[in-house]
Amino acid sequence: MAQYSAEFKQAKVLVLGDVMLDRYWFGATNRISPEAPVPVVRVQENEERAGGAANVAMNIASLNVSVQLMGLIGQDETGSALSLLLEKQKIDCNFVALETHPTITKLRILSRHQQLLRLDFEEDFNNVDCKDLLAKLESAVKNYGALILSDYGKGTLKDVQKMIQIARKANVPVLIDPKGTDFERYRGATLLTPNMSEFEAVVGKCNTEEEIIKKGLKLISDIELTALLVTRSEKGMTLLRPNQEPYHLPTVAKEVFDVTGAGDTVISVLATALADGRSFEESCYLANVAAGIVVGKLGTSTVSTVELENAIHARPETGFGIMSEAELKDAVAQAKARGEKIVMTNGCFDILHPGHISYLENARKLGDRLIVAVNSDDSVKRLKGESRPINNLENRMAVLAGLASVDWLVPFTEDTPQRLIGEILPDLLVKGGDYKPEEIAGSKEVWANGGDVKVLNFENGCSTTNVIEKIKLLKD
């Protein structure tokens, strides 16, 4: 197999479709209401996530790719909340705000990881004049390498034929995750990505691989597509194109926690790769790998370039996890959702020695994941003196990344990791040496969050300073 990469240097993607705000209320359920036979949920946390076409844009932004999002929202609080959420991820929002309709919002109430109720706030946009949206599309589409039309059947894409023609006139490929059984409305699109049930609802039941291929190629011909990608759940996905062999990819998911938004991930990565100049085969391969990652997460989620790169090269998360703070926060949230215990430590780790190895192995045994926060070069210099560090940050983190005991690495620039620890809030904070727990940076934040703090012993005689002194003696 070719050496594929999750780095998309040239890609720019435009997304247009049904944007939504997903709200989650989490709480404990310990009793039944005296008013009616329903559980009482004591809400303890709440969360907001981008849904629909907005989740597609979030998926693209998580790949460090330039993305613009177009759609219809209301002139309301939820529209403002959605816009703010997206802008924080550097997504260029180009919405048409309506006085007549609310922003589509879905509120889910959960307890102990079980969804108890979903409340939908919406009115379809089928009676809305979309001329302003079409004008925005015509003005912007020529600046992008791919257009995704994200259809959730809410009416934003009622003029989908006009949208396809605008993009094709600008020589921009159009990818659509279809909705409903009227695929004729998508005539002339570059590629559709129906799941198996959506595909069979249009072409009829397929009992064999041959039937899928035959009916898929006929659909391509009937509605003038360039290609068709059928996503087939546990059977992977199949790419069909006229006069070419079918390209089948088996599923790569190891464990399925939630399929919410998996289709969004597929079309996001697929469009991003095509916009970056990749082939259909490589683009589908990357999309399939990304889908395998995202179904292992809880709720509507995205895939980072680190996760995708690791999966492409069959790297386990353990031992290869150099991350930005934002990527780490996402990884920790997903791990906690799976019930994993997060352990965190920090240090300079200038010259790695047996004491470090033993310490990190012991720390890792205390939980399911170990985070190592590493002082930046300037931070080490302030703490240790002008002659340090011996090894720069990049090299120090690369060496630590090779240890099986280390799950994730993150740099910090301050003298202490107190702020970072307060953001990550591990279940257990550990530090080596003769500290008292209350003296450890970040201990107050961890305790306040219900976590614990533990001091581990270092091996006697093992220190970076001792190593440096021995080297000096050899030199003399």
Swiss-Prot record:
It is an enzyme of class 2 (transferase). The keyword Acetylation does not apply. The keyword Kinase applies. The gene is hldE. One of its GO terms (cellular component) is cytosol. ATP binds at N195, M196, S197, E198. The active site is at D264. Residues 1-318 are annotated as: Ribokinase. It holds the Pfam family PfkB. It comes from Haemophilus influenzae (strain PittEE). It catalyses: D-glycero-beta-D-manno-heptose 7-phosphate + ATP = D-glycero-beta-D-manno-heptose 1,7-bisphosphate + ADP + H(+); D-glycero-beta-D-manno-heptose 1-phosphate + ATP + H(+) = ADP-D-glycero-beta-D-manno-heptose + diphosphate. It comes from the Bacteria. One of its GO terms (molecular function) is phosphotransferase activity, alcohol group as acceptor. GO terms for biological process: ADP-L-glycero-beta-D-manno-heptose biosynthetic process. Catalyzes the ADP transfer from ATP to D-glycero-beta-D-manno-heptose 1-phosphate, yielding ADP-D-glycero-beta-D-manno-heptose. Residues 344-476 are annotated as: Cytidylyltransferase. Pathway: Nucleotide-sugar biosynthesis; ADP-L-glycero-beta-D-manno-heptose biosynthesis; ADP-L-glycero-beta-D-manno-heptose from D-glycero-beta-D-manno-heptose 7-phosphate: step 1/4; Nucleotide-sugar biosynthesis; ADP-L-glycero-beta-D-manno-heptose biosynthesis; ADP-L-glycero-beta-D-manno-heptose from D-glycero-beta-D-manno-heptose 7-phosphate: step 3/4. This is Bifunctional protein HldE.
